[in-house]
Amino acid sequence: MFFSSCRWSSVPWWTDSQSDKGEKIFRYDRLVDEFVSLNSFTSLQCMNTEYPAATRLLIEEVLAIGAVQEPRKADPSFRIPFMYTQISGLNQSIVVGDSLLGISLDKYLGRDYPLYRKYYHDYQRRVMDRSWLVSDALFYYLSHEYPLPDDKVHTLLDYIADYGKIHWVIAHCRNISLEQEAGFEEERVLWYKENETEVWNWLMGHGVLTSADLTMIRLFMEPRGTTPYIGKDSPDQIGLWLGLQIIDHYMKSHPRVTIGELLHENDYEKILRESGYHPSANKK
């Protein structure tokens, strides 16, 4: 695969010499290996600037042979995206257009990459690693293909269940746990489980679950370190945890519902009602 991506060149840069007067063979495979193994930003830049055709072939055609085709098994109407990579200047990690999926490789160089440590918080850096690339790409593309309808104002419940739905589908398709897909460390999972009932009762009792206040929605959905309204030691993304539980209960209660049907379902009040999810009752 990589040999076919190499090219003959008389330029003595990153090459294997065959003879003093012979041609030079550029080792594209070495660039890929250094980028994958060492998170080499220099190698990544070279792949995209000096050898764009080879990199485009690798990303758009070779990698497309694999798991990117899997969603069609769950939903035949799923559109396989045309993929490309880019250097975004630390802008958006994933860019989605009409059947297009752009991946900013400079946002996945490892959480301890020096530039990240200088400009990003710990909670932001925890997903800036290549192990997150697949989940991020799938999440943003699925969210684009199966969006919340724009004919109504959406509540926290809508976002909780919608995020939970997309992540649940990704975990199912990738055959990994819900916690692994969401990036929940053991400490956070323990807190969620111990405080699930109290958090749910607080959301219900204060009318937050049915609130369309974007500030409150962001507070419970986005990475931010802590969730102040619940307590100074409470972790972030509590809404995502609750959404995963709601969808998991719903799918276990409706084994005949397909992944495709779930993706097209946007009535989240119905899903909550039919899921049987109620933390205090579930713990009995």
Language model features by range: what are they?
Residues 211-284:
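C-terminal soluble interaction/assembly domains
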Residues 164-227:
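Acidic/His/Gly-enriched intrinsically disordered linker/tail segments
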Residues 156-164, 190-194, 233, 237, ...:
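Soluble non-cytosolic domains of exported or imported proteins
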